[in-house]
């Protein structure tokens, strides 16, 4: 959807679609040419124009395997859990974050996603349920979510509309001193098993993540 490019103020003439079309002849020089760079981090962006049919027809295995040979850690953001494209990513992933909210309609969608993974033999053990925009005062409780999904909630990210809205307007990630920023940092530490060392007094949570990736 272009969110990463918007948040990081990145532009590139290439996207993951170019990586897919060159997957069989990919080498490190071609790969580096496709990347946008943000503070030393390689970012493979989505195309400026919607890539019709990619989610249904493509397989990300070759691209992910190549990326895995270059980097210690690869983060992939996909918009839907269904179809060969999403399944190829799920099967290649060591850990799979299923992001939902505590609204009833989103919980139903999460149930469908988990059932789809089960039918297609994606190991349930690597699925991590993350509840975004969570509020104890509004919506379903964590206990209800866990009972409905038959799995534990791995992490909750608090509802923090004001911080997120300001960050989007300013084109930056949520500061790590805010509730949502702290929660994202905690999620990164849980996934990596390593504490993040702050490199400046007021870093953003996304900067902390990329700081870890650089090490």
Spans of features found by a protein language model:
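NTP-binding/hydrolysis catalytic cores, primarily Walker-type P-loop NTPases
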Residues: 169-215
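Conserved C-terminal guanine-recognition region of P-loop GTPase G domains, centered on the G4
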Residues: 107-126
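Phosphate-binding loop that captures ATP/GTP phosphates
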Residues: 1-43
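Beta-strand-loop-alpha "switch" segments that mediate conformational coupling across diverse proteins
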Residues: 133, 145-174, 184
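Conserved Switch II/interswitch segment of TRAFAC-class P-loop GTPases
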Residues: 93-111
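Phosphate-binding/switch loop-helix module in NTP-utilizing enzymes
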Residues: 46-86
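Conserved nucleotide-binding/hydrolysis micro-motifs of P-loop NTPases
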Residues: 1, 25, 49-51, 80, ...
């Amino acid at each position: 959807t272009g969110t990463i490019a918007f948040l990081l103020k990145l532009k590139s003439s290439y996207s993951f679609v170019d990586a897919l079309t060159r997957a069989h002849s990919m080498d490190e020089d071609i790969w580096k040419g496709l990347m946008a760079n943000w503070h030393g981090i390689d970012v493979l962006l989505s195309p400026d124009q919607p890539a019709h049919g990619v989610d249904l027809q493509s397989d990300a295995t070759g691209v992910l395997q190549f990326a895995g040979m270059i980097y210690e850690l690869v983060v992939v953001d996909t918009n839907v859990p269904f179809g060969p494209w999403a399944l190829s990513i799920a099967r290649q992933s060591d850990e799979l974050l299923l992001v939902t909210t505590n609204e009833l309609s989103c919980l139903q969608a999460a149930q469908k996603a988990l059932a789809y993974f089960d039918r297609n033999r994606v190991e349930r053990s690597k699925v991590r349920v993350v509840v975004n925009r969570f509020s104890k005062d509004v919506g379903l409780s964590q206990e209800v979510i866990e009972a409905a999904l038959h799995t534990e909630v791995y992490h909750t990210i608090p509802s923090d509309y004001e911080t997120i809205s300001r960050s989007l307007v300013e084109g930056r990630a949520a500061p790590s001193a805010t509730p949502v920023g702290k929660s994202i940092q905690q999620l990164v530490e849980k996934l990596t098993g390593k504490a993040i060392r702050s490199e400046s007094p007021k870093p953003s949570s996304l900067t902390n993540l990329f700081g870890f990736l650089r090490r």
